[in-house]
Amino acid sequence: MEGIKLTLTNLEEFKCEFTLENCDISLANSLRRILLAEIETIAIHNVKVYENTSSLPDEYIAHRLGLIPLNSAKVDDYNYIWNCNCQGECDRCTIHFDLRVSNFTNEVLEVTSLDLKQRQDHTDEDAVRPIKVYSILRDEYGNKREVGIPIIKLSKGQQIHFECEAQKGIGKMHSKWNPVCISTFSVEPEIIFDQEIQNLDIEQKKALVNACPTKVFGINPHTNTLEVQDHMKCMYCEECVYKCAEDFQKPKLIKIDHKKDKFFFKVETTGVMKPVEVLRRGFSTLRQKLDFMREQIQENSNNQFEYGNE
């Protein structure tokens, strides 16, 4: 992975944008898939139901609990349950939560992720707990107001009691372990003019400018030459190419292509990790996979060489 250049262009609490250069599309797509499905996180995996008099069936609530994002900054401190030395579930592989809410009021009570309590209280900010969610409305003092993720609403007299077990996993096992909800990349358009395009008259050039739905082209007011004003707006519809071919009978005036070694990534996390941490783990996983592939290729090559000498 030597020579690859990464430029971080935008960083927010849950989002980041970066440019990846000096690599091909196979590597870029591998990184995209790894960010989606191969970063270790923690999520609720098992749910034990002790009481549920709400209007929703047990499995509906259990499914919602599994999809609540849990802070996974310390995921490395935990083992996979199948790799743990314990006989069952210990603090090294399982985090226990309780959800026990009763509604004794006459109003409808909303149960949220704030009601999901870990059995052992942790003051550490990075402890495994539901991520913090804030309302767009601030309190009377102008401070952010934590509201939690809605789970269910209880009417008067209804109550629920669930025991939840959170474990380590990756998105390949189930999407609830995905650290990101968006991981996409786009390429940089490359628009090439033939020299003959400047021989078009001014009306033809204006028609070509108007043919583009995203207004990629423009006419220089001083020289009356056709120019590419914003190539990043190109969406590869090739309306300009069709215009040249059908109206001007010159199909080769414009060529639409893209750069093969530059990619623009957009990544949005679920909140379980900071975007930069997701990227760091993504590149680390990609390097491990490439190293493993190289070792296997070398091993197979050596075996074939020994077989040939026999």
From Swiss-Prot:
One of its GO terms (cellular component) is RNA polymerase II, core complex. It holds the Pfam family RNA_pol_L. It is found in: Nucleus. One of its GO terms (biological process) is transcription by RNA polymerase II. It comes from the Eukaryota. GO terms for molecular function: DNA binding; DNA-directed RNA polymerase activity; protein dimerization activity. Its main location: nucleus. Keywords: DNA-directed RNA polymerase, Nucleotidyltransferase, Nucleus, Transcription, Transferase. InterPro entries: DNA-dir_RNA_pol_30-40kDasu_CS (IPR001514), DNA-dir_RNA_pol_insert (IPR011262), DNA-dir_RNA_pol_RpoA/D/Rpb3 (IPR011263), RBP11-like (IPR036603), RNAP_Rpo3/Rpb3/RPAC1 (IPR022842), RNApol_insert_sf (IPR036643), Rpo3/RPB3_RNA_Pol_subunit (IPR050518). HAMAP family: RNApol_arch_Rpo3 (MF_00320). Belongs to the archaeal Rpo3/eukaryotic RPB3 RNA polymerase subunit family. May be a stage-specific RNA polymerase subunit. This is Conjugation stage-specific protein.
